[in-house]
Design a protein with these regions (language model features):
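A polyanion-binding, active-site-adjacent surface
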Residues: 1-222
Length: 222
């Protein structure tokens, strides 16, 4: 889990609130301070140098992200798996293969998208992520979003969607809806859906995931 030290990275959480529009759409509004010369390379260096992250201090490998530095679609997962740690890249193994097929179904190649996770490391002992570790990682994720500046964000799985949107709803309640993230001077739609690893276990949810993918396709056409 990549931790966070505000004085080192220059990223500090700011105003946080939700705005409910007349049509019921939820806008998540946040402000975060970033270094003037921020970049994916700088964010990755800050992740690896984090003094508060137990995983980083223990020398756990970091899985930061993959894809073009400017991408129309940004895909955010929960945290790296064993296959990801071995390769240093997110969404490897069977779940990654399914994700590739999902993207191909809406005429997108993996190489066109920026992929990352909320959590950047596997915790020592491969235990579950703590709330503190998730919060330590979150500012790095927001900086990644600002750097990539995607047109659309897909949040895969409950942890990714809940962390990004500050929601306590389940992924089944969140999916199928388009949220808006207003981050500093940027505004982008966020669409939560099921994690491919979950779809491998619960195949009957693939129909709902396909409905979500069609919505992503429509958002990218706008």
């Amino acid at each position: 889990m990549a931790g966070h030290n505000e004085s080192q990275s220059g990223a500090q959480p700011g105003l946080l609130f939700d705005d409910l529009s007349n049509d019921g759409a939820v806008t998540r509004v946040e402000s975060i301070q970033v270094p003037p010369d921020d970049s994916l390379a700088k964010i990755m260096a800050d992740v690896k140098a984090s003094p508060v992250c137990g995983a980083c201090k223990a020398g756990m490998p970091v899985v930061f992200g993959e894809g073009p530095s400017q991408a129309e679609l940004m895909i955010i997962g929960e945290g790296p798996g064993v296959d990801d740690i071995h390769s240093g890249l997110p969404f490897q193994g069977p779940a990654g293969m399914l994700l590739n097929k999902m993207l191909a179904a809406i005429n997108l190649a993996r190489a066109e998208c920026y992929l990352c996770n909320v959590i950047k490391c596997i915790p020592p002992g491969e235990r579950k992520f703590s709330v503190e570790e998730i919060e330590d990682c979150r500012p790095f994720l927001l900086r990644q979003i600002l750097s990539v500046n995607p047109r659309v964000i897909v949040a895969l799985g409950a942890l990714a969607a809940q962390t990004l949107l500050r929601s306590k709803e389940t992924i089944s309640e969140l999916r199928g809806r388009v949220f808006t993230l207003r981050l500093n001077d940027r505004e982008m739609p966020v669409l939560p859906t099921f994690n491919p690893a979950y779809l491998l276990r619960v195949a009957e949810k693939k129909r709902e995931a396909w409905d979500d993918l069609k919505l992503v396709r429509e958002l990218l056409k706008k």
